[in-house]
Amino acid sequence: MPTINQLVRKNRKQKKSQSKSPVLEKCPQKQGVCLQVRTMTPKKPNSALRKITRVRLSNGKEVTVYIPGEGHNLQEHSIVLVRGGRVRDLPGVRYQVVRGSRDALGVDGRKQSRSRYGAKK
């Protein structure tokens, strides 16, 4: 416990909260170019081939981005919009592609939560 004198000399420091999506630089989304599109296996106890892509953002930073929904049309040099939002069973994946925007088509045949997947009615 510090004395009053110590607090007068050097006051208490506020803890700064660290951003969960630092490369977006406080923007809601950022545009980027796909460098490679591949799959990744999730942590235990899950088992699948999750679709991911490596993206170079407009600020020059590279991130691993998850492609949500069933099926996609992304390939190398596709332009995508990237938003924050981690995927719990993929370590190191903290961003997601916005479906239905730029080169990423929406999920066709989607009936529920369509706005998340860029699906038309």
Curated annotation (Swiss-Prot):
Any single Gene Ontology cellular-component annotation: ribosome
PROSITE patterns found in the cross-reference section: RIBOSOMAL_S12
Keywords, sorted A to Z: Methylation, Ribonucleoprotein, Ribosomal protein, RNA-binding, rRNA-binding, tRNA-binding
Pfam families found in the cross-reference section: Ribosom_S12_S23
InterPro entries recorded: NA-bd_OB-fold (IPR012340), Ribosomal_uS12 (IPR006032), Ribosomal_uS12_bac (IPR005679)
Biased composition (Basic residues): 9-18
Positions where 3-methylthioaspartic acid occurs in the chain: D89
Highest taxon of the lineage: Bacteria
CDD domains: Ribosomal_S12
GO MF assignments: rRNA binding; structural constituent of ribosome; tRNA binding
Region (Disordered): 1-25
Any one GO biological process: translation
Function of the molecule: With S4 and S5 plays an important role in translational accuracy. Interacts with and stabilizes bases of the 16S rRNA that are involved in tRNA selection in the A site and with the mRNA backbone. Located at the interface of the 30S and 50S subunits, it traverses the body of the 30S subunit contacting proteins on the other side and probably holding the rRNA structure together. The combined cluster of proteins S8, S12 and S17 appears to hold together the shoulder and platform of the 30S subunit.
HAMAP family, per the entry: Ribosomal_uS12_B (MF_00403_B)
NCBIfam families to which the protein is assigned, alphabetical: rpsL_bact
Subunit structure: Part of the 30S ribosomal subunit. Contacts proteins S8 and S17. May interact with IF1 in the 30S initiation complex.
Record family assignment: Belongs to the universal ribosomal protein uS12 family.
Name under which the protein is recorded: Small ribosomal subunit protein uS12
Organism for this UniProt entry: Rhodopirellula baltica (strain DSM 10527 / NCIMB 13988 / SH1)
